Every structure is written in C-alpha cells, then in structure tokens.
Amino acid sequence: MLYQQISQNKQGTVVLLVVFFALLALIGASAGYLLLDNYAMGLVLALVIGVIYATSMIFQSTSLVMSMNNAREVTEKEAPGFFHIVEDMAMVAQIPMPRVFIIEDPSLNAFATGSSPQNAAVAATTGLLEVMNREELEGVIGHEISHIRNYDIRISTIAVALASAVTVISSIGGRMLWYGGGSRRQRDDGDDDVLRIITLLLSLLSLLLAPLVASLIQLAISRQREYLADASSVELTRNPQGMIKALEKLQLSQPMKHPVDDASAALYINEPRKKRSFSSLFSTHPPIEERIERLKNM
C-alpha cells in the first residue's frame, strides 16, 4: 500500500505537469493568434518565456531562501539532536548531508530547500524542536529529506515559474488587445466567418481564465508533493506513527510570527500563515486530517 501510494502521487504530478505545459502552449497560441495572427510564434514564445522563468528560479540561492525566512545556520555543537536526526535521515535516503538551519519562532514548522540534493538545506522552528519528541522529529525531518530526495523543490519551482509565465503572457496579451493591438487580419477583414468568431472568443476566454487555471494546477502539484513526502517519510523511518503523531501536533500549531510570502509558504510542512476558510483547491497544503487518514490507511 505504501509503495502504491508513492507511485500514484508521482504519476499524479507527471499528469499535472503535462497539463501545465499544455496550458502554457494554449495561452501562447491564443496570444499569438490574437496579436500576431500566428499560432506557432505565440506558442514558441510562451514556451521560451516559461523555460527562462523556470531556469532563473531553480538556481535561486539556498542561502537567500533561508535569509528570507529568518533562518540561521547551526552546527552540530549548537543543535546536536536536530543535527543528528537530519544526518541519520540523509544517510537512510542516500543523499548528501544538507545544511541545517533554525528559525526562532514558537510555531511548529519546518521546510527544505535546494534545487538538488547537493545544495539542499533543512530548517526547523525552535517551537518544533522544543515540542516534538525524537519519534515525531524523525517523521518531520524524514518528510523534508524526502522533498530533497524526490526533487520536490525543483518541481514546485517549475510549477511556480510556469504559473508566473502564464500570468505574464495573459496580462501582456490582454493589455495589448485593450490598447488597440491585435493582428491586422482581425482588425481589417470584417470577416463574419463563424469559425473565426468562435476561435476569437475561445482565444479571449483562454487569456482570461488561464491565470486562474495555472494557479489551481500549481497548488494541486504542491498538495500532491506533500502527500508524497508524507508517504516517503514513512518509507525512510519505517514508522507511520511518528509521522501521524507529528501531524496531529502540527494541526494545533499557531501561524508563524514573521511574514511568509507565497513561494516560501509552499515549502513548509504545515501552512505557516493563518488558515483560510475558502476551498482547499486554493491551498498550498492538503488538509492535515486527510494527510493523517492516508497514513493510517497504508
């Protein structure tokens, strides 16, 4: 059951990424049709923008991400218990030892960052380290190490970059149309051809809806990788109860004291900001109740 769930989560992410690239291609083709009367050029430009966004974000410095989250790097001497758990989990996962950081915050939370296992880092709040016992900490750190081993940070970064690219292309296309852009043929032909009108309307609709759809796909990928990291943590620790107990404590945690931006929020094991009342479709994290239920059903 454990390996089946891991496989299903990975397959789900692949499907979502394929849909994401299809959406990027669609919005590019739509913008190309409306502005240049050239589907292919719009599609190519959209994919180029997406690749540039993704590449620039993937190589964002680990130290910069940690600095943005008020995390301080610690040595084995400063935090031996935490350090050794990270070391043990990294050894089991067969990845290089990540750098270790602590965030001075009473809330219960942790996250990992780094585009690859070779430049990764793990951070935990002081609240988490004080409240959780070793069994629970192993579950949490196993979760974060799994994010590193599964290249989740890279996948999530690509998803954020693609969502940003879709939004930028949609915004540029909309503004150009509003201020009198559009292809010469669409302005001058006066063609009442039904197919052309339908294509025009569908292209306009895709420009309007694409940013929302892109955001929903990006958030779905984030939630999918959280489920995968939970299951992968159990694979590393061989102890589902440790992860379940940790999630039960995380469920009671208060929001973090310092502001957390959207990109950083998706990295944490638990939503670091005040819980929102709207649909889970717009959340970076699955409901903790569902995460616990999945672990119990393994």
Swiss-Prot record:
Q: Which Gene3D superfamilies match?
A: Metalloproteases ('zincins'), catalytic domain
How would you describe this protein's topology in the membrane? Multi-pass membrane protein
The keyword RNA-binding is assigned to this record: no
* Ranges annotated as spanning the membrane: 14-34, 39-59, 158-178, 197-217
Which domain of life does this protein belong to? Bacteria
- Alphabetical list of InterPro entries matching this protein: HtpX_protease, Pept_M48_protease_HtpX, Peptidase_M48
Enzyme Commission numbers on file? 3.4.24.-
Q: Which UniProt keywords apply?
A: Cell membrane, Hydrolase, Membrane, Metal-binding, Metalloprotease, Protease, Transmembrane, Transmembrane helix, Zinc
The record's subcellular location field reads: Cell membrane
Please classify the protein's predominant subcellular localization into one broad category: membrane
**Per its Swiss-Prot or TrEMBL entry, what cofactor is needed?**
Zn(2+)
| Keyword Glycoprotein carried by entry | no
Q: Show the active-site residues.
A: 144
Provide any one GO MF term from the record. Answer: metalloendopeptidase activity
Biological process terms in GO annotation: proteolysis
Top enzyme class, one word, equals hydrolase
Q: Cellular component terms, GO, for this chain's entry?
A: plasma membrane
Cofactor, how bound (note): Binds 1 zinc ion per subunit.
User: Family per UniProt?
Assistant: Belongs to the peptidase M48B family.
Protein's name according to its UniProt entry = Protease HtpX homolog
Taxonomy of the source species: Bacteria, Bacillati, Bacillota, Bacilli, Lactobacillales
